[in-house]
Every structure is written in C-alpha cells, then in structure tokens.
Regions:
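Short beta-strand scaffold positions
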Residues: 10, 42, 77, 97-100, ...
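Active-site charged/polar residues at nucleotide-handling catalytic sites that mediate phosphoryl
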Residues: 36, 93, 109
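Acidic catalytic patch
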Residues: 71-92
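Short, well-structured N-terminal submotif of metal-dependent ribonuclease cores
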Residues: 1-42, 54-65, 136-137
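Alpha-helix capping/helix-boundary segments
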Residues: 14, 46, 82, 102, ...
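A general structural signal for well-ordered alpha-helical segments in protein cores
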Residues: 26, 47, 63-66, 83-86
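Acidic, PIN/NYN-like endoribonuclease modules and their adjacent C-terminal/linker elements
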Residues: 1-7, 32, 49, 75-76, ...
Length: 137
C-alpha cells in the first residue's frame, strides 16, 4: 500500500529553530524535515522572514540551509490571492497579519498541515483554513 504524502507548510519559526535552536529543540524539526512522506510548501513571506537576516548577519551556513530548503519546497507567488485570503482570515479569526498571509499561502497550496512554533494559545491556532500543528506538542 502506497504511503500518503503530507503536504506541509513550515512557518518561519520552524526553519529558524531548525538552524539556530539548542539540539533538544531541533530534534522535532529535523524529524519533520527528514520525513520522506512530506512535500514542503512555501511562500515568499517565509523567504523574507528568514533569508535576509542571515545575509545581513553574514551567516553563510544559515543562508545555505534556507536556500536548500527553498529549492526543495513548492512556492506560491500569487500575491493577490494570498493578500485577499489573508485579509479575510485575519478579519474572521483575528490572526496577526503575517500569520494570516502564511495561512492563506498554505491554504492556496492545499497544505495538509501548517506547522508552527507558536504556542497553542496564540491566535494562529484559531484558523480553520488549514490544520495548524504546534511543533512541540
């Protein structure tokens, strides 16, 4: 029986944790990143939240890590659709603007999971656009 592919959108905090966190915090991220049953999804917003800071701080290894991830991920560039869906989700669920854009991108990419480091008490978990998963739960 063929295994089901899990369409996975990683929030920026997950990628930052994967590279910068203490080993015990990196473990859950590495399990996700190394899961052969996952296909990764992304938006230009994740790229913007991660890559420029690594470049500014001259952290070449971190920059290469992000670039490797982005080459592997399927990215949407439909800004008009992301902005429209994100606005509606922010108004409906009260999520913050950047989270709304990430959730909209995940929804448009038909993600099965949106994985975040945001605690379950945060507004991103109120969204119903996509299944929101706390990385550390």
């Amino acid at each position: 029986m063929a295994r089901r592919t899990i369409r996975t959108y990683l929030d920026s905090g997950v990628l930052i944790t994967a590279y910068n966190a203490a080993p015990e915090l990196k473990e859950p991220v590495l399990r996700v990143l190394e899961d052969p049953d996952r296909v990764f999804l992304c938006s230009p917003f994740v790229h913007l939240e991660t890559t420029p800071k690594a470049l500014f701080n001259k952290r070449a290894g971190e920059y290469r890590f992000y670039q490797t991830y982005f080459r592997r991920a399927t990215m949407t560039n439909d800004l008009k659709a992301m902005l429209g869906r994100g606005f509606r989700e922010a108004a409906r669920a009260g999520v913050g603007p950047m989270d709304a854009l990430h959730l909209a991108a995940a929804h448009l990419l038909k993600a099965d999971e949106f994985i975040t480091t945001e605690k379950p008490s945060k507004s991103v978990h109120r969204s119903s656009l996509v299944k929101v998963v706390h990385l550390f739960s």
